[in-house]
Curated annotation (Swiss-Prot):
HAMAP family: Cys_tRNA_synth (MF_00041). Its main location: cytoplasm. It catalyses: tRNA(Cys) + L-cysteine + ATP = L-cysteinyl-tRNA(Cys) + AMP + diphosphate. This is Cysteine--tRNA ligase. Belongs to the class-I aminoacyl-tRNA synthetase family. The lineage of its organism: Bacteria, Pseudomonadati, Thermodesulfobacteriota, Desulfuromonadia, Desulfuromonadales. Binds 1 zinc ion per subunit. It comes from the Bacteria. ATP binds at residue 269.
Length: 481
């Protein structure tokens, strides 16, 4: 099966065939750096990180460009409120964004351009549009004329007449048509500005991405991504600007990730259900958040809640428990001359899932099946003496680490990760690690004295707090849930 992707432009899955064999150019709209990133930003960036990783995994040479929007109305407003420059504010939140993405385990894009470093490219692109007669200057502002681009709204499939009837011209704007949008904004007091043929000013939001994407990927490239909220107006306007200037198809495949709801409601500051990545990572491990995002198909809406994150933590713990158990057993089983195709089989079904429009939910399901097989085999009587089964577990273990790496998962030492999770969960019970060890000693003493009622009482008391005691040949261990 070859890779198929869902193209927003056509509304269907298509076989992925890049413009240049073996090479992929991918542009993803980055954040506007005026505040800390929220869970919606986490989803978009994790999704396209996985797409980037998987394309590389299957052999493509990928140039991945993800920008910073570092000049914008929101940045200017926030900077003025704080009494600092836009540059200072943008720099602060670029650093914060990078820290958040590093914690989430994102691979670094090939290029991370800033809009303010591409003013010359933006000005040149605006001039090309004026020269082609589809943009016009008005009192220092420059607008794109949507009526002169007949295929406008082809991405969002909106109706021009309906859009026009609902559009309004903001006081001070000198548009010919309410639907026209700004390419260049004349300078205003208290705003950053750059020189241009139309006087000092700054770029509009949409033109920034057109200029940066074409600068690094060419006038036509393979993949443009972002959240569904960017389809209109941002991506629609990018198409109009770019194709209006070049006369060429701008992007071959448009990919958009779904929304994040919070407790089945739209995330909104006004509803009080707005969570930054930093808020979430105070309670949950970054890999848990990443795992949660990947358990849904990227185009589907995803519901963020404490319960769903707890479920994700439990699911990821099961992977690490299986990997930890397998590593301990395999360490006592020297490699033999028997091989197994189990790893290759797992990779095949994993790739089938990912080739179906990057279906991470199905891919993770196949990895879960592998962990269940490992857990079953290593607990079978006589396992260590069965060379075929040892080889099967070794092959599955190696494949899990390899394929998990494609998803940015299972990157920690299993024993260390499980201990960290145990201690984090224990902290919510009011007990300390030494408290649990003391309970275990008391229980051992009770059992030694045949006071089984007291031993059961201790076990049940801990279980009520979400702490499970695990009796084994090496003694009693504990696990917090």
């Amino acid at each position: 099966m070859s890779l198929r992707v869902y193209n927003t432009m056509t509304g269907r899955k298509e076989e992925f065939e890049p413009l240049q064999p073996g090479k992929v150019g991918m542009y993803v709209c980055g954040v506007t750096v005026y505040d800390y990133c929220h869970i919606g930003h986490a989803r978009a960036n994790v999704v396209f990180d996985i797409i980037y990783r998987y394309l590389q995994f299957i052999g493509f040479d990928v140039t991945y460009v993800r920008n910073y929007t570092d000049v914008d109305d929101k940045i200017i407003k926030r900077a003025n409120e704080r009494g600092i420059s836009s540059d200072t504010l943008a720099g602060e939140f670029i650093q914060a964004f990078d820290e958040d993405m590093n914690r989430l385990g994102l691979a670094e894009p090939t290029i991370q351009p800033k809009a303010t470093c591409h003013i010359d490219h933006i000005v040149n692109l605006v001039q090309r549009l004026i020269d082609r007669g589809i943009a016009y200057e008005s009192q220092g502002d420059v607008y794109f004329s949507v009526e002169d681009f007949p295929s406008y709204l082809k991405l969002s499939k909106r109706n021009m007449d309906e859009m026009r009837s609902g559009a309004r011209i903001t006081p001070g704007e000198q548009k010919r048509n309410p639907m026209d949008f700004a390419l260049w904004k004349a300078a205003k007091p208290g705003e950053p500005s750059w020189e241009s043929p139309w006087g000092p000013g700054r770029p509009g939001w949409h033109i920034e991405c057109s200029a940066m994407s074409m600068e690094y990927l060419g006038e036509s490239f393979d993949i443009h991504g972002g959240g569904k909220d960017l389809v209109f107006p941002h991506h629609e306007n990018e198409i109009a600007q770019s194709e209006g200037a070049t006369g060429k198809p701008f992007v071959k495949y448009w990919l958009h990730n779904g929304f994040v709801n919070v407790n089945q409601e739209k995330m909104s500051k006004s509803l009080g259900n707005f969570f930054t990545i930093r808020d979430i990572l105070q309670t949950y491990d970054p890999e848990v958040l990443r795992f949660f995002i990947l358990t849904a198909h990227y185009r589907s809406p995803i519901d963020f809640s404490d319960q769903n994150l707890q479920d994700a933590r439990l699911g990821l713990s099961r992977f690490y428990e299986g990997l930890h158990a397998a590593s301990e057993v395999l360490a006592a089983c020297p490699p033999g001359d028997v091989t197994s195709e189990a790893g290759a089989t797992l990779e095949n079904v994993f790739r089938e899932a990912m080739d179906d429009d990057f279906n991470t939910a199905a891919a993770i399901g196949h990895l879960f099946d592998a962990v269940r097989t490992i857990n079953r085999l290593i607990t079978e009587k006589g396992f260590r003496k069965n060379r075929e089964k040892v080889a099967q577990v070794r092959a599955l273990y190696d494949a899990l680490l390899k394929l998990g790496g494609v998803l940015g998962l299972f990157v920690s030492d299993p024993a260390a990760w499980l201990k960290q999770m145990n201690l984090a969960m224990l902290a919510t019970t009011g007990y300390t690690e030494s408290d649990i060890e003391d309970f275990i000693r008391q229980r051992q003493e009770a059992r030694k004295n045949k006071d089984f009622a007291r031993a059961d009482e201790i076990r049940d008391e801990l279980a009520a707090k979400g702490i499970q005691l695990l009796d084994g040949p090496q003694g009693t261990a504990w696990k917090a849930r």
